[in-house]
Amino acid sequence: MQSVEDLGLLKMDFLGLRNLDVISDSLELIKETVGVELDIDNLPLDDEKTFNLLALGESIGVFQLESPPMRALMRALAPSSFEDVAALVALYRPGPMAANMHNDYADRKNNRKPVEYFHPDAEELLRDTYGLMIYQESVMRVAQKFAGYTLAQADNLRKAMGKKIRSAMEKERESFTSGMESMGYDTKLSEEVFQVISQFADYAFNKSHSYGYGLVAYQTAFLKAHYPVQYMAALMTSVKGRKKEDSAIYLNECRHMGLEVAVPDVNTAQMNYYPDIKSGNRSPRIVYGLSAIRNVGEGIVSLLISERNSNGPFVDFYDFCERVDLQVLNRRAIEALIKAGAFDSLGHTRQGLLASYEQIIEQTVSRRREKEMGVMTLFEVAPDDVSQVFDDKVLIPEIEFEKQQRLSFEKEMLGRYISDHPLRGYEGTLRRKCDATSQGVSSLDEGQVIKVGGVITEVNKKQTQRGDLMATISLEDLEGEIEVIVFTKAMAQVGHKLATDRPVIVTGRVDRRDENSKIICLEVEELKSDQESKVTSIDVRIPATGTTTKHLENLASLLSEHAGECDVYVHLGSKRIWLGADVRVDPDSGLLGELRVLFGAECILT
């Protein structure tokens, strides 16, 4: 690729972003549902609601800003301008993070550290980035100001940095230092400044790239803050057909936001996820897309929606069978619709429909085909009332599955639990007891020992070559699934606890050697519901070394933000200190995760 550039040819990278489709789909849904034509290219870049969302770290689904470490950084930085958003894009990369620039930027912005410049003359150049050269353009301006570089010379310096060409950087040293001396700066300072620039060469980022990505990040955050139902519907549509963990994360985020995601409904659902904001007294919700149901193709969905749009909602299952195109009455597709709950609103039970739908379809198809061929009823009259056609109709029994079976069928057809979840009522315990979620494991260190909670959805036991027993299990939490490997030694201790549909907490080591992260099981314990494991106090260990006054200030702020009914005890060395009746917290509000970010994963002793 270097030879192509040397020939003078232009090299351009084109990046296809799914998020651009999410933005355009959101704009269409906003126009359809509330009649607002939003000009996405001219949004106000000082929107308070958007910055509040980002400062709280509520950025799941926001371009570039949704990973757990990024959300933690945003809470520390509290972005309040578009420039902060662009800086986040540049800072959240291995180089700047290894140099602790991301924390320096956050601390300097919020007056936790003084803003320092390598020379007073640099203030006018680096004031907007708090004295840090986080962009290549910052380095170019320093070279022009301090070494008298022309714009072309500064651009050559930028190229050397951007391509990480160390040899080219060394060639620049002599011209840079001599240039600074000619500008009246001493030799020592010139060496120091070039050394600073050389360090930044490892991670300085292109400003136009950061601002371009930052704008898309801001636009998606704005849409989530102001039009959450439409945005989340478009976001979930964008991951339709992708790995199910993606949609599970966004489904859980909808629940966190207080948005209901309803099972698909033959009377209200569209091809894709759709915001249902005209629901009478009910809060706005998102209805699951019909085409996202397993075994239900887009062709069938188009025919179904066409009939509904032409002749109104379906009255019951008999009416549905009588009206839709015969292609829709595909047994495989109808079974999938039933299991997914798409006929629930018609007043039928899922078990009742599964017991009778084949006979109803057979009866309907036979009669409709006879009618098409000119075969009339006994009285040679076609009644207008569908119920008259079904004088001998097959009855739908009023029987229903147990909750677990209904949810199992939902997951089979939709890839995830929608109407409910086996872990509903366990959320607080999961936050208190666990260090990570299934989807957070991939960002942890190899070999790190963690606790992850969930429900066991699959157990596969097998014998090793030596005849010993081991197992692999699928553990599902509210964000997705992760594979847990139980080797022989652990199997002897915990094998009796491994059963499908059982809520458990797994203690294990992170294994990231393969493409998909796994957990090597060490222990398994029962996961108790929030009601069973209700706590009256929490214990927080504060490290004896490395804890600063700022850490303690952040602790006080967190405890104040998460006020509740639980007492708080702080462990300092061998002392256990009660913080008093005025300091009580809600441990299920996300506090424990914040404390782990502040003091480390092992700080919660409760």
Describe each PLM feature range.
Residues 1-606:
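Noncatalytic, beta-rich nucleic-acid-contacting surfaces in large DNA/RNA-processing enzymes
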